[in-house]
Amino acid sequence: MLTFLIPTAKEMKPVPPCYPHQLPQKSLPILEAMAELSLEELARAYSISIEAASKEAKRLKAIAQGQSPAYPAYQLFNGLMYRHLKRDNLSKAQQDYLSKQVYITSSFYGIIPTDEKIAEHRHDFHTKVTINGQSLKHYWRPIYDQFAKDHKQIISLLSSEFKDVFSKEYQKLWISPKFMEERSGQLKTHSTISKKARGAFLTACLENNVQTKEALKQLSFAGFCYNEELSTETDYYYIKKES
């Protein structure tokens, strides 16, 4: 069975219904460390304005007091990749695929199933906070590595920010899809191409119930097709040809 890893997104959009929120035990020290920061320190930790930090402080307080509503993570996150992922009108099989084979890597919640109920929050691995003297990456690394150890065939749709939380010995075992577009005879890639393509790729996987590496190579989605010439054992290249 294939296991997919995807990143969080800064943009969030609450979609009813909401649910009670239960913060995982491992997330509590992070919440406590963030709650100890002054408004100025919080602004520096997030690299945002005081006004924006005030909004985050209220969110953190609501989470700490158990008053924050929670939403399925794949519905709450609303970045470019998530907007290009099929999230509505899923069949039972597609919903099962999304909730049982796709996991979100979070600097606040750890590695969670896509349908895990989470609260609105602002947090990533660039957030400047230490937990018992450790950076966020070092704090989560044992748990991330254990996940990689327990899941033999990982398909990584992670950016380097999230990928680097894992020890390199696990990273080198993954399959990492790469997405490029052909323009004026040249192959181009940038974050917008990659983010949109990740969502379309994952949609194709759940719609076709892809379970093997060979099936990944047969996929065609949003104009992208597998390119055997560029691909390696661990990097699968998908190219969108000029029309």
Curated annotation (Swiss-Prot):
From which organism does this entry originate?
A: Streptococcus equi subsp. zooepidemicus (strain H70)
What does the entry list under GO cellular component? cytosol
Q: Which Pfam families match?
A: H2O2_YaaD
Question: What name does UniProt use for this protein?
Answer: UPF0246 protein SZO_18530
HAMAP family (UniProt xref)? UPF0246
Name the GO terms of the biological process aspect. response to hydroperoxide
PANTHER family in the record, alphabetically?
PEROXIDE STRESS RESISTANCE PROTEIN YAAA (PTHR30283:SF4), PEROXIDE STRESS RESPONSE PROTEIN YAAA (PTHR30283)
The family annotation for this protein states: Belongs to the UPF0246 family.
